[in-house]
């Protein structure tokens, strides 16, 4: 299902303006970029997403288009993207985003830019439920507080908390269902606070999937503490080194850096055998002192049989994010007599940069041989070496 994201960043930030902030919340800085960029990077880590439509206040469209072009230098996102102006209300902004989607789009994720901490796993959960055939999907978390309905300042009713969830974004929809719901809302004059409510009113079932407590929305001045908590103040450099080997033989088609190498020999492996991503994952784990991939994804576990190495790398990246590692550079080397990799060098480099959310200029890829010596020279296998550098918060 061809899926795009509507990243809503068109709000005026009225509640935060009362705190004297000079800009709306979606433009506040986080990790050296505007808040909305964190969500864009998250979406880029999820397989199956083809592009993003950024929806900004109309007067910010050109400014933010230029800013995204600078941030995406070297195709950091690895996705198509467009920038459009929003409307006076949230529904209007979603409608503006829908109008900018390509004709090939079949499904859409609607996400609030003020939720910068949604994880790739959460996005993938929503996307998976869409692929299962649901027309609408929303993440939700159980309520921990008792909720009261009030009238004129007095308690009127206490709903059963066990039947309530607090919903979040991204919310996923088939394009047909969401477009129909918005058209019906315009005709009927409905005004709701999220897109799932439009489907409800149209009688279209909406599936709930597990949300994340950390996926909080930056709304009030008190919420700004979450941004401060995600900005390490003092960092120290760190280095990680990774090494992996696979032998040739009947097994898996060769993949390097997530790129299929059709002329390469098959490799014997428990997972999909991407020796380059395995070495890279080990190097990343080394940077944060978290062991190696054999510890986290043992070959004795059937769950990882033919596992997608890009998925394993994404799990490792989640660990590095939790450790607040800021990756700065990656240097990768393949040692193999065959196949010849020069035709694939740029594609491998670009894909690794996309997976790591780094500029291509921060990823180096080399291929060499051992001049006919050893098992690689005898065309019996392949080696990969990875070195990564980064910055971590000072202990």
From Swiss-Prot:
Q: Which GO terms describe its molecular function?
A: 2-C-methyl-D-erythritol 2,4-cyclodiphosphate synthase activity; 2-C-methyl-D-erythritol 4-phosphate cytidylyltransferase activity; metal ion binding
Q: Which reaction does this enzyme catalyse, per its entry? A: 2-C-methyl-D-erythritol 4-phosphate + CTP + H(+) = 4-CDP-2-C-methyl-D-erythritol + diphosphate; 4-CDP-2-C-methyl-D-erythritol 2-phosphate = 2-C-methyl-D-erythritol 2,4-cyclic diphosphate + CMP
> What is the role of the protein in this entry?
Bifunctional enzyme that catalyzes the formation of 4-diphosphocytidyl-2-C-methyl-D-erythritol from CTP and 2-C-methyl-D-erythritol 4-phosphate (MEP) (IspD), and catalyzes the conversion of 4-diphosphocytidyl-2-C-methyl-D-erythritol 2-phosphate (CDP-ME2P) to 2-C-methyl-D-erythritol 2,4-cyclodiphosphate (ME-CPP) with a corresponding release of cytidine 5-monophosphate (CMP) (IspF).
Required cofactor(s): a divalent metal cation
Matching HAMAP family, A to Z? IspD (MF_00108), IspDF (MF_01520), IspF (MF_00107)
Residues holding 4-CDP-2-C-methyl-D-erythritol 2-phosphate: 244-246, 270-271, 292-294, 297-301, 368-371, 375
Q: What Enzyme Commission number does this protein have?
A: 2.7.7.60, 4.6.1.12
A family per Pfam = YgbB
Q: Which UniProt keywords apply?
A: Isoprene biosynthesis, Lyase, Metal-binding, Multifunctional enzyme, Nucleotidyltransferase, Transferase
Report the family membership. Answer: In the N-terminal section; belongs to the IspD/TarI cytidylyltransferase family. IspD subfamily.
Annotated site location: Transition state stabilizer: 15, 25, 270, 369
> Region (2-C-methyl-D-erythritol 4-phosphate cytidylyltransferase) spans which residues?
1-237
Q: Which residues bind a divalent metal cation?
A: 244, 246, 278
This protein's name: Bifunctional enzyme IspD/IspF
Q: Where are the residues marked Positions MEP for the nucleophilic attack as a site?
A: 161, 217
What PANTHER family does the annotation carry? 2-C-METHYL-D-ERYTHRITOL 2,4-CYCLODIPHOSPHATE SYNTHASE, CHLOROPLASTIC (PTHR43181:SF1)
The record ties this protein, via PROSITE patterns, to: ISPD, ISPF
Per the record, the domain of life is: Bacteria
User: What GO terms in the biological process aspect are recorded for it?
Assistant: isopentenyl diphosphate biosynthetic process, methylerythritol 4-phosphate pathway; terpenoid biosynthetic process
**Which species is listed as the source?**
Nitratidesulfovibrio vulgaris (strain ATCC 29579 / DSM 644 / CCUG 34227 / NCIMB 8303 / VKM B-1760 / Hildenborough) (Desulfovibrio vulgaris)
Pathway the protein contributes to: Isoprenoid biosynthesis; isopentenyl diphosphate biosynthesis via DXP pathway; isopentenyl diphosphate from 1-deoxy-D-xylulose 5-phosphate: step 2/6; Isoprenoid biosynthesis; isopentenyl diphosphate biosynthesis via DXP pathway; isopentenyl diphosphate from 1-deoxy-D-xylulose 5-phosphate: step 4/6
Give the region (2-C-methyl-D-erythritol 2,4-cyclodiphosphate synthase) as residue ranges.
238-395
């Amino acid at each position: 299902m061809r899926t795009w994201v509507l990243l809503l960043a068109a709000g005026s930030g009225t509640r935060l303006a009362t705190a004297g902030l000079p800009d709306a919340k979606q433009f506040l800085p986080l990790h050296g970029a505007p808040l909305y960029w964190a969500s864009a990077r998250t979406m880029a880590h999820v397989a199956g997403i083809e592009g993003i439509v950024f929806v900004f206040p109309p007067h910010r469209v050109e400014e933010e288009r230029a800013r995204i072009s600078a941030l995406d230098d070297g195709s950091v996102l690895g996705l198509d993207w467009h920038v459009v102006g929003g409307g006076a209300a949230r529904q209007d902004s979603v409608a503006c985003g829908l109008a900018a989607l390509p004709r090939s789009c079949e499904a859409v994720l609607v996400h609030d830019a003020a939720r910068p901490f949604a994880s790739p796993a959460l996005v993938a959960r929503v996307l998976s439920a869409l692929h299962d055939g649901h027309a609408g999907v929303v993440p939700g978390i159980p309520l921990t507080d008792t909720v009261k309905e009030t009238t004129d300042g007095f308690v009127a009713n206490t709903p059963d908390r066990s039947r309530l969830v607090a919903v979040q974004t991204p919310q996923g929809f088939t394009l047909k269902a969401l477009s129909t719901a918005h058209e019906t809302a315009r005709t009927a004059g409905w005004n709701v606070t999220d897109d799932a409510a439009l489907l409800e009113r149209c009688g279209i079932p909406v599936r709930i999937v597990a949300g994340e407590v950390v996926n909080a929305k930056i709304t009030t001045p008190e919420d700004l503490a979450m941004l401060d908590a995600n900005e390490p103040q003092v960092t120290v450099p760190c280095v990680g080194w990774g090494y992996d080997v696979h032998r040739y033989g009947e097994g898996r088609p060769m993949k390097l850096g997530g790129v299929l190498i059709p002329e390469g020999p098959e490799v014997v492996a428990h997972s999909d055998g991407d020796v380059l991503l395995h070495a890279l994952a080990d190097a990343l784990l080394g940077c944060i002192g978290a062991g190696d991939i054999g510890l986290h994804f043992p070959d004795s576990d059937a769950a990882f049989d033919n596992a997608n190495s890009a998925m394993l790398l994404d799990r490792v990246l989640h660990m590095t994010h939790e450790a607040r590692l800021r990756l700065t550079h990656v240097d990768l080397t393949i040692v193999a007599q065959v196949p010849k990799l020069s035709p694939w060098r740029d594609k491998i480099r670009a894909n690794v940069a996309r997976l790591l959310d780094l500029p291509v200029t921060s990823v180096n890829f080399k291929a060499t041989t051992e001049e006919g010596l050893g098992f690689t020279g005898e065309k019996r296998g392949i080696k990969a070496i990875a070195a990564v550098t980064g910055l971590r918060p000072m202990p």
